[in-house]
Design a protein with these regions (language model features):
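Short, flexible loop motifs at catalytic/binding sites
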Residues: 1-182
């Protein structure tokens, strides 16, 4: 059983009631669990045709978030008992970078959930929901050039992949007053 803090309630309220959110808090406060993992699972269960992208400061970190979501669909006995089997069929992709649930009724080139590290290529992709979780880290916030590169990637590569009626939710920790979260 999880202890839900006021911060978690605030994040849940924000992402449930707005198409564009920014939630910042120190490391270790559970932002990712509530605003990333739990939210992705909820959205996928509600709409198996959804296309969600989880972005993080590195590909490895983005894949770790995706793996946590995917593992719930593979091993969470309560989720499987209540909602059934959502794992892959022989035609669906199911790996560390992306997965597609077997309940989809519309053919789409994008997976149900895709993991992408900051500065990764997103050409020809379109997403209904983008979750930027810890896009900013010490490694890309120290210098003006690093901050500028991240902002350029975010606004000219990532943001245009969001569908016109899509949602974008950013979760993170501030590392510099002039970082992406300014």
């Amino acid at each position: 059983k999880r202890n839900v803090m006021d911060l978690h309630k605030s994040i849940i309220s924000n992402i449930s009631n707005s198409k564009s959110t920014l939630d910042l808090a120190p490391r270790g406060f559970g932002k990712s669990t509530v605003g990333d993992v739990d939210y992705c699972i909820t959205r996928i269960l509600r709409d198996p045709n959804i296309r969600i992208m989880i972005g993080s400061k590195t590909q490895t970190q983005a894949e770790a978030f995706l793996k946590e979501v995917r593992t719930h669909f593979e091993q969470n006995e309560d989720l499987i008992r209540i909602f059934g089997d959502w794992k892959t069929s022989k035609d669906n992709v199911w790996n560390d970078r992306e997965f597609t649930v077997n309940k989809r009724s519309i053919i789409k080139k994008e997976a149900t959930l895709t993991a992408l590290g900051a500065s990764g290529a997103v050409i020809s992709k379109h997403f209904d929901v983008i979750i930027g979780d810890d896009l900013v880290g010490l490694e890309n916030a120290r210098t003006e050039k690093q901050r500028s590169n991240l902002k350029e990637w975010f606004y000219s590569s990532l943001f245009p992949t969001l569908e016109p009626d899509g949602e974008i939710h950013i979760l993170g920790t501030r590392y510099n007053p002039l970082d992406l979260y300014e």
